[in-house]
Amino acid sequence: MKKFLFFAVVALAMVSCLNKGAFSQSYTADVTFECSTHEYTHFFKDSVYVMSNPEDQGFLYGQYPLFWGQIQKNGDFMGGFLMSYLKGEAQGKLDKEPSSNDAYRVHSPSGALGSMTYVVFYDNPVESMMPKYDLEFGYKGLGTCMPLGCYVNNTTLVARKIKEHFKDGDKLVLKAKGTTSVGKVTEASIVLAEYTEAKDSVMYNWTPFQLSSLGTVDYVDFEVVSTNPEVPGYFCLDGYLASIKVEY
């Protein structure tokens, strides 16, 4: 039986009504991943939160968006999502010595819009080490979910590997694939880094990633594609927005 850790979600515009015995609720979910003092104290270790056993694999926000992660029996994180409030350096600096947790550290001094907490996603190239779904609409049988967007950024580890190994022609791209239970597939993408003869660009600031082109979906799966195998598939996500409607 899968269990979830519950966190708050801000409903920006909510309408609920009862009509002939039916319940209807429509709102825009703004997922910021901020936690209470109790949650930071009891669930996070070294500023990172990973589910403690293979039965506890998801973050459930406002009952509807499910962010999945995969861990082994010994508790090692393998792929998908975890939460972090590790902070990096500003404006692309890499002056500090490398750390073992740089994979889970955003390469910015805070989360998006100054928030404390964000999620880190790892696209493990070994498929069996990944959760079945990355992001799931929990009430997909009772309503609809249309992702609107989020903020994304690189981790410190990725920024360091790019600096060490990227050459002209190399590129790092984040892809989001939306699917429904009937098989409809939609996609969106954003460039996280690109080296060309004219310019080298690396994402060092929280950047909007528009997801409305995915339309109404049941699941969103992420893929990090690099032309250079030395750059691992991590990225940071914060401020997830989705338009949700539930009826029952």
Predicted stretch roles:
Residues L174-Y248:
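Terminal, low-complexity interaction segments
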Residues S36, N153-T155, T179:
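Short glycine-rich beta-strand segments
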